[in-house]
Amino acid sequence: MGKIIGIDLGTTNSCVAIMEGGKPKVIENSEGARTTPSVIAYQEDGEILVGAPAKRQAVTNPKNTLYAVKRLIGRKFDEKEVQKDIGMMPYQIVKADNGDAWISVRDKKLAPPQISAETLRKMKKTAEDYLGEEVTEAVITVPAYFNDAQRQATKDAGRIAGLDVKRIINEPTAAALAFGLDKTGKGDRKIAVYDLGGGTFDISIIEIADVDGEMQFEVLSTNGDTFLGGEDFDQRVIDYIIDEFKKINGLDLSKDAIALQRIKASAERAKIELSSSQQTEINEPYIAMANGAPVHLTMKITRAKLESLVEELISKTLAPLSIAIKDAGVKVSDIDDIILVGGMTRMPKVQEKVKEFFGKEPRKDVNPDEAVAVGAAIQGSVLSGDRKDLLLLDVTPLSLGIETLGGVMTKMIQKNTTIPTKFSQVFSTADDNQPAVTIKVFQGEREMAVGNKALGEFNLEGIPPSARGTPQIEVTFDIDANGILHVGAKDKATGKENKITIKANSGLTEEEIQKMVQDAEANAEEDKRLKEVAEAHNHGDALVHSTRKSLTEYGDKLEAGEKEKIEAAIKDLEEALKGSDKAAIDEKSAALSAAAQKLGEKMYADMQAQQAAGAAAGDAHAAGADGQADAKAQHDDVVDADFKEVKDK
């Protein structure tokens, strides 16, 4: 069995990790970074860029550069959160035939799982490059507060990327695994995982216990907001910059897609810099034109100003904290450790608010960008059987139920129920001689079904005619370990039953997923072909360059016919290099190599002659040196004698 990799599919950044020698390892991507921007760009020539290369060209290609797509995954176009995003994003969010929110790029409609699959494919390739083998299985994380439709859509994205998703696990739970892995022997402890990422916020209360030598991670409660994160913080800064610029220059930059993209990049940079400094400067020259002259954007932003802009957003995270503590049945003072996850938790004001709430400092020994991927890799090692001393008990974040008479939401499974779980309840008909019942499934906490998220519906038909309230219809809810719901209904009198795996009454059909998988495979083939063409081009270019250089140096040693043959072969190869036919380039490269063989022989002969001449010169030099040595030796034989002059007497 191959490795099961762990992937944190983030709103802003993604990360991949594996277990190696019993220890988790975060893998660097092809750019040498440990995290990859969740940005996908669709180029005019059909090429798809993912990560840093996509982010770099966003300013010049704003309408076809997609980011924060996770905020749309598993959502309907008409949801208020999606409508809010439409006004914020430079790309076009459209309504799909099934009512889902999709994105229009270069005259094509793309589903969010299809786009997210590009990021997952990059993560898969990153792991494969490191391991040197194919990877087909993964554990992918999602925000704890993701509903059934969002979880199913994430699983679909994995399938489109060519991955068998062995488990979908909650991000705070994954972070707890990463934190608790090396905390054995420290006794039972309750931890709070505060996860404020690029697009979502989660809080989970988790108990880590040692049960008969096995580490047990039990989620006691979870809460959050799937539409609150760093993107919203960025938007506050963007709005402030646009307003200030308008006051000073009278120009509205919000309608200029390219200017908006530059401001977004500046706002994100400023937000990050203000986590470590008190003041930063935004400097975007030539942001607009006024009266034929360029206008520059220069502005200072202080940490205090940033904090005042986002104070309300930080405060919005506090209500879920209180609910999670209450639902877990614990007191704030019972929490032993607070773990911060997600890039936004680097903001000093966020840390300060968390400290105020819990009355203690959050821990700083967990990497907020990598902990989730590490936890996913740990869970992968549990699923593969490599690790047997760890048990994870997660929960369903929202209540699940069906619509009953009067539009009431009858809850079958309460929120924060440990999963996997199964629950059955008997219902009956509302009318006399009713031949069928429609089971409408909802997820949420409102008392009336209409106020909750509709997950799907199905019919149970063929109920024998009888008075209302007589038939016994048993409805069963079954949630698997991924948090995905399966619902069945059975007429106890006839034994007739109907079952479905809840796929949001929108969602992608099996046919759509298969088509997207095929498209992705075709893209992979095309990418491989383009790479091979590029390599052939590079080889051809290098061959032309080196042959030309050699021809300049040694061409005069060739016969006229040989030289002409090489020059003709160079010309043919240069012509082939203007196109993208790999076979033609390879053929002309081979022809040039063959034609240049004589040139190579002349070069080799010349080099040998030079070496021989060098050796002869060396011998002559050595002989001269020997003569000098002999002469010196002869002189060395002479004995210097002392003499005394004798004078005549």
From Swiss-Prot:
Determine the domain of life of the protein's source: Bacteria
- Give the start-end ranges of region Disordered: 608-649
Which Gene3D superfamilies does the record match to this protein? 1.20.1270.10, 3.30.420.40, Actin, Chain A, domain 4 (3.90.640.10), Substrate Binding Domain Of DNAk, Chain A, domain 1 (2.60.34.10)
GO terms (molecular function) for this protein are:
ATP binding; ATP-dependent protein folding chaperone; unfolded protein binding
- Biased composition of type Low complexity is found at 608-631
What does the UniProt keyword field contain?
Answer: ATP-binding, Chaperone, Nucleotide-binding, Phosphoprotein, Stress response
On induction, the UniProt comment says: By stress conditions e.g. heat shock.
- PTM sites of type Phosphothreonine: 200
Q: From start to end residue, where is composition biased (Basic and acidic residues)? A: 632-649
What the entry lists under HAMAP family is as follows:
DnaK (MF_00332)
User: What is the annotated role of this protein in its UniProt record?
Assistant: Acts as a chaperone.
Give the record's family classification: Belongs to the heat shock protein 70 family.
Protein name as it appears in the record: Chaperone protein DnaK
Lineage, opening ranks: Bacteria, Pseudomonadati, Pseudomonadota, Betaproteobacteria, Burkholderiales
- As recorded in Swiss-Prot or TrEMBL, the protein's gene is named dnaK
